């Protein structure tokens, strides 16, 4: 009768034990997925597989084009949602629409870097429908593979918003439309109107309207930044259209202006020369002598 046999952790067990990779122990990297994203055919030389990497934090979205080398991963180009205020989007930097803008920005940036931006303009008007870039006569489109990391790939996840932005920007990324926002499982097809609504922030606009009617006080607090910037539900679509146009006009990364280093106060005493030390000693001696002479005069007056 077989059963569960507890591992005997003997001297031999510990001697032969091999630890897993550090990023596996930390739960940061799925190596089963990574090896398939990075391993290139052995008959191809100096032709890396490029990955379209998307990661989310609480306040930012990071999109990168990365390729692997023996020395480590090399980031060829990157775009962040905190760059979007430069293009006119100052609030809502982590939603589906912002993810689309970040993906679009990265696509236009990397194509500009490779000199393909004129040849592959992508889908200029976002309609919500699926889009595949058509190869041109001279140069093939820039191909990358979607790297989602440890994100759970549910339908409508923001990572697919970034993917859609990159596709409309002109990148060639193998994909299916099954995970875009608006895909209907029963009908097995994408509802492009719903997807377009998400791309232009329509879901946020609907939420703004419903909250303004039902809970006005909560609305004032929840959308305080939107209200400060003068953004309302009706102007949401026009705002995102302007952002998309601004990204296409200038996708290059802005150079950061470095401030001049501040002059720090010196707290350590500056080293004095021999003449300065001698003069200082003379001053101190004179001060002591004068104070001693003043004390003697006071004592004589008291005796009288």
Curated annotation (Swiss-Prot):
KW Ribosomal protein (keyword) present: yes
Cellular component, GO annotation: cytosolic large ribosomal subunit; nucleus
Record keywords: Cytoplasm, Nucleus, Ribonucleoprotein, Ribosomal protein, RNA-binding, rRNA-binding
InterPro entries: Rbsml_uL18_euk (IPR005485), Ribosomal_uL18_C_euk (IPR025607)
Location of the protein in the cell: Cytoplasm; Nucleus
GO biological process, one term: ribosomal large subunit assembly
CDD domains named in the record: Ribosomal_L18_L5e (cd00432)
GO molecular function, one term: structural constituent of ribosome
One matching Pfam family: Ribosomal_L18_c
Gene3D superfamilies from the UniProt entry: 3.30.420.100
Superkingdom: Eukaryota
Function: Component of the ribosome, a large ribonucleoprotein complex responsible for the synthesis of proteins in the cell. The small ribosomal subunit (SSU) binds messenger RNAs (mRNAs) and translates the encoded message by selecting cognate aminoacyl-transfer RNA (tRNA) molecules. The large subunit (LSU) contains the ribosomal catalytic site termed the peptidyl transferase center (PTC), which catalyzes the formation of peptide bonds, thereby polymerizing the amino acids delivered by tRNAs into a polypeptide chain.
Quaternary organization: Component of the large ribosomal subunit (LSU).
Family of this protein: Belongs to the universal ribosomal protein uL18 family.
Protein name: Large ribosomal subunit protein uL18y
């Amino acid at each position: 009768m077989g059963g569960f046999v507890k591992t005997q952790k003997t001297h031999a067990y510990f001697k032969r034990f091999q630890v897993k990779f550090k990023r596996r122990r930390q739960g940061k990297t799925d190596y089963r997925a990574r090896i398939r994203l990075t391993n290139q055919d052995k008959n191809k030389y100096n032709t890396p597989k490029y990955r379209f990497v998307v990661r989310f934090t609480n306040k930012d979205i990071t999109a990168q084009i990365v390729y692997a080398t023996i020395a480590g991963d090399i980031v060829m180009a990157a775009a962040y949602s905190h760059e979007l205020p430069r293009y006119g989007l100052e609030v809502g930097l982590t939603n589906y629409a912002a993810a689309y803008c970040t993906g679009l920005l990265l696509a236009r940036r990397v194509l500009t870097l490779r000199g393909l931006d004129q040849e592959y303009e992508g889908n200029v008007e976002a309609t919500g429908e699926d889009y595949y870039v058509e190869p041109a006569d001279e140069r093939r489109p820039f191909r990358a593979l979607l790297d989602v990391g440890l994100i759970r790939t549910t339908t409508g996840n923001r990572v697919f918003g970034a993917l859609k932005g990159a596709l409309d920007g002109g990148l060639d990324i193998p994909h299916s439309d099954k995970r875009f926002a608006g895909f209907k499982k029963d009908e097995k097809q994408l509802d492009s109107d719903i997807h377009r609504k998400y791309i232009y922030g329509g879901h946020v606009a609907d939420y703004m309207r419903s909250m303004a009617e039902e809970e006005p006080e909560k609305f004032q607090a929840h959308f305080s930044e939107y209200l400060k910037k003068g953004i309302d539900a009706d102007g949401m679509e026009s705002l995102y259209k302007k952002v998309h146009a601004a990204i296409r006009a200038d996708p290059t990364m802005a150079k950061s202006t470095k401030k001049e280093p501040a002059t720090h106060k010196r707290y350590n005493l500056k080293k004095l020369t021999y003449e300065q030390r001698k003069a200082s000693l003379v001053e101190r001696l004179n001060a002591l002598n004068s104070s001693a002479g003043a004390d003697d005069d006071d004592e004589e007056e008291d005796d009288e």
